[in-house]
C-alpha cells in the first residue's frame, strides 16, 4: 500500500514515534521510516506492522474476529457505541486525535470519528485479523500492530482521547500520551452483563467481581474520574447471534459455539456496562 493510499496514517503521522529510537516516523511509499532508517511496513490490508519479529504476539484469531463482526453488525452494542461517542465528543477538539488501545475491529473508534467530524484516530491491537478490519473501518482511522503493555509508539502528550473498550490497560502509557486536557474513556462490564448467557452456558463468559476495585487501584495514581454512565438494556438475540457472542470472547478458546444447541441459548440477554471518563492527575 502506498503512502497516498493511507490517508488515516497521514493524518496522525506527527504523533507517531519509532519504537526503537523514539525518532519521528515519516510516511513513505509502503512503509513508515525514521531518520535512523528503522522501517515498518504497511501491510496490503492497510495496517502498519510496528510489532514484529521476536516481539510479535498473536491476539484474537480469525473465527473470533468474524464472530465479533457479525455480532456487532446486528446493532446489539450500538447503545454502548453511542454512549462512548457522545463522551468523546464532549472532550476533544474537532481535529483531535483518538487512540483506541486494544481496538479490535475498530467498531468504537469508527463511532467516535463519525461523531466528531474532523477527528482522527489510531487503533492499536496485537491481532492481525482484527487490524485488517480496523485499518479500513473509517477513512480517518489508522491501525497498527502493537502490544498494549509496552510503551506506545507515540509521542508524549500527542492524543486527545484514549479509548479502552473491554481491553487490557496500561495506565502509565495512557497518562504519558494524553494531552493535558485529554480524557481516558473506559468501558467495562458490570456483574449483570450477559447474565442469561452465563447462566445457560456455564463456564462461558466470566466476570470478575473484583474488577472494579482493581480498575480503581490501577488508575488512581494517574487519573481522576470525571463522568460515570451506566448503559443497560435487554437485547433480543437469535441463536446464531448468541453463538457469535460466545465466539467473540475468550470463552471461544475452550467452548465450541457451533456445538451449543439452540435450546441451551437464551433468546435475550442483559447488556450492562459502565462507561467512565477520567482526567489526568498530576504526578
Question: Where are these predicted regions, by residue range?
Answer:
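N-terminal auxiliary segments of SAM/dcSAM-dependent transferases
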Residues: 2-58
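Conserved Class I S-adenosyl-L-methionine
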Residues: 13-14, 229-283
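Class I SAM-dependent methyltransferase Rossmann-like catalytic core
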Residues: 57-83
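Conserved class I S-adenosyl-L-methionine
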Residues: 94-104
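Conserved SAM-binding loop of SAM-dependent methyltransferases across substrates and taxa
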Residues: 105-117
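Conserved SAM/SAH-binding beta-strand->alpha-helix loop
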Residues: 125-129
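A short acidic, Gly/Pro-enriched loop at the edge of an enzyme's catalytic core
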Residues: 149-161
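Conserved beta-strand signature within the Rossmann-like core of class I S-adenosyl-L-methionine
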Residues: 182-189
Amino acid at each position: 500500500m502506498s503512502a497516498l493510499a493511507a490517508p488515516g496514517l497521514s493524518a496522525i503521522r506527527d504523533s507517531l514515534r519509532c519504537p526503537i529510537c523514539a525518532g519521528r516516523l515519516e510516511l513513505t511509499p509502503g512503509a513508515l521510516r525514521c531518520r535512523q532508517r528503522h522501517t515498518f511496513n504497511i501491510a496490503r490490508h492497510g495496517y502498519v506492522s510496528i510489532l514484529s519479529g521476536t516481539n510479535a504476539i498473536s491476539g484474537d484469531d480469525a473465527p473470533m474476529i468474524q464472530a465479533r463482526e457479525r455480532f456487532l453488525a446486528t446493532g446489539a452494542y450500538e447503545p454502548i457505541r453511542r454512549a462512548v461517542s457522545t463522551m468523546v465528543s464532549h472532550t476533544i477538539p474537532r481535529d483531535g486525535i483518538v487512540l483506541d488501545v486494544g481496538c479490535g475491529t475498530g467498531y468504537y473508534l469508527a463511532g467516535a470519528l463519525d461523531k466528531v467530524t474532523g477527528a482522527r484516530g489510531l487503533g492499536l491491537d496485537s491481532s492481525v485479523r482484527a487490524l485488517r478490519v480496523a485499518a479500513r473501518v473509517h477513512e480517518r482511522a489508522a491501525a497498527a500492530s502493537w502490544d498494549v503493555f509496552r510503551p506506545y509508539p507515540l509521542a508524549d502528550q500527542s492524543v486527545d482521547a484514549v479509548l479502552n473498550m473491554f481491553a487490557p490497560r496500561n495506565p502509565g502509557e495512557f497518562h504519558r500520551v494524553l494531552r493535558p486536557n485529554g480524557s481516558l474513556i473506559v468501558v467495562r462490564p458490570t456483574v449483570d452483563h450477559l447474565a442469561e448467557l452465563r447462566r445457560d452456558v456455564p463456564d462461558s463468559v466470566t466476570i470478575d467481581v473484583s474488577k472494579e476495585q482493581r480498575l480503581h487501584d490501577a488508575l488512581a495514581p494517574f487519573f481522576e474520574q470525571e463522568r460515570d454512565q451506566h448503559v443497560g438494556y435487554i437485547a433480543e438475540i437469535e441463536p446464531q447471534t448468541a453463538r457469535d457472542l460466545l465466539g467473540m470472547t475468550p470463552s471461544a478458546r475452550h467452548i465450541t459455539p457451533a456445538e451449543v444447541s439452540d435450546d441451551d441459548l437464551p433468546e435475550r440477554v442483559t447488556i450492562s456496562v459502565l462507561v467512565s471518563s477520567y482526567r489526568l492527575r498530576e504526578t
